[in-house]
Amino acid sequence: MKIIILAAMLGGFISLVAPSVAEGQKTLAEKLGYDADAKLLIVHADDIGVARSVNIASARAFESGGITSGSVMVPCPWFPDFAAYYREHQPLDVGIHITLTAEWDYYKWGGISPAGEIPSLLDEHGHFYSTVEEVGTHADPVEVEKEIRAQIERALALGIRPTHLDTHMGSVMAKPELVQIYLKLGREYDLPVLVISGSWLQDAPDDIRDAIAAEKPLLDGLYMMLADDPAKSWSEA
């Protein structure tokens, strides 16, 4: 059994889920009502809320069946716009794309929390850092938990009923303490979190690997898909 998550920003990632199953136990596919060896496809768009154009493209993709799932960047300027769309088009499979970075040179954002409460997450201009490495260097885990919680609560306040948590640029993987917070809040809010096994997990530091290894199901891989990728570059997993 394989579950394939195909995602785009619109461009994004492909993830494979193939958890091992003990004899006599149902596979994940069977628990979802499918045959044990079924291949299931979820098409997922992240970075919703980052720009009006992304919101429009994502809405059209939801309506046409081009995507079946997505995740929103709550701190970004165009999040309220998508939240309004979401409220008028429920139910949609939309998660929270936990955001701790602002990677563009001339288009920036900060946190949902007051700046004075999360100083370790912000640069000298009051914006999130551009890179995951900077998050790992500067971020105070207490402030990270405060900000992630604020993003979840902000989404709930605007009517989003999230189906999962994932992470912009993988920023919650910057150091083990942040991974633990990510998993903790997923359990607290009863939301599945995006976690990856395969070669990524094997190459991760021991403490990060140990924190993630207990989560189920794990994704076997994460692959970017961009709009200009030629069709011939894709093959069945």
Describe the function of each predicted region:
Residues L40-I42, I67-S71, P91-H97, P162-D166, ...:
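Structural preference for beta-strand elements that scaffold enzyme active sites
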Residues P141-S233:
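Catalytic domains of cell-wall/extracellular-matrix polysaccharide-remodeling enzymes
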